[in-house]
Amino acid sequence: MYVRHLQVTDFRSWPHADLTFEPGPTVLVGSNGQGKTNLVEALGYVATLGSHRVATDAPLVRYGTQRAVVRAAVVNHGRELLVELEITPGKANRARINRGAAGKPRDVLGILRTVLFAPEDMAMVRGDPGERRRFLDDLLVARAPRYAGVRSDYDRVLRQRSALLKSAGAAKRGGSGGDLRTLEVWDGHLARYGAELLAGRLDLVAAIAPHVTSAYANVAATAEETAPSGRVADVRYRSSLGESLPEGYGVPRGEPADVEVLEKALLAELERVRAQELERGVSLVGPHRDDLELMLGELPAKGYASHGESWSFALALRLASYHLLAEDGAEPVLILDDVFAELDRRRRSRLAELVAGAEQVLVTAAVAEDVPEELTGVRFDVREGEVRRVE
């Protein structure tokens, strides 16, 4: 899979930009603030319908304009598809595939798969659980786009149920019972969608765990990171179900997670914590409270890993994602956004060795010399609102 062509209109800082790419490595070089990250962010948006930098679409539209348009021609196994996304904050976004209207924007998911390495990746290791949940869900949707709908349905039910908990809790404290029958209905919805999302995550963790272990061993830059026998990297799923989670779930398994079993477990745990939820006015159980534990030996990477080990783990998560998606039959486009400036020379070289053979690698850098020789292919200079190919 590779991107042959990218065109953006009023996206971020760009009134217009038009780039033609080739398979292999491509480097976009420009000083900070010139807009090179905005270009690869546009490709990430085509792949995920979201940005790795902001949570809403509004900042993606150039100041003073009403909408942004991103077009990408993607080649996969010899077949080219043209994806067009029209981003209009406050309104429904529109999507086209080969110039024909798509039913919903998420119909384009799966046409382009990307794995993006960025300085923000350190938050996956050192940040809040939400960062790791997002990592899991984005990868889950990349592998199986239908999970975009599951996640959307779960988020919608969670908002409705949480609002009901607040009102029912206030009514109970005021002396009335509140409508608990309605709450039971929302319990059922939350358990149904939550079980689907949870099953997908559990299966994903089981699939990616061996890739994380091997990727960490490959990318670790110093002997101190890999020599001690207890410093093997691993990932484990920690569920808010606690002891209600069936035995064996949360660790790599040899069989798919059972949605019905998980739904029953969620319903049982919701009933158990009902009084606490009414008291606090929040939903205490479900995938939104879960975490992906990143382990180095028997210790969690968060809080115990050094700065170098944390970077190695972040890179390992992205490399593992790449290998997992490639196993599925469609090698993703690799995007390395200002990553080499964050890495020491050893990690730069090792990462370049590991990704140089990918079908397409797009690299952004402020200084061309930061990019290892293995990835110095086609070069574009990004300067003063223009993109120029360097021959």
UniProtKB/Swiss-Prot annotation:
Q: Does the keyword Transferase apply?
A: no
Provide the leader sequence positions: none
One Pfam family, short name please?
Answer: SMC_N
- The source's superkingdom equals Bacteria
The entry's localization annotation reads: Cytoplasm
**PROSITE patterns from the entry?**
RECF_2 (PS00618)
- Name of the protein: DNA replication and repair protein RecF
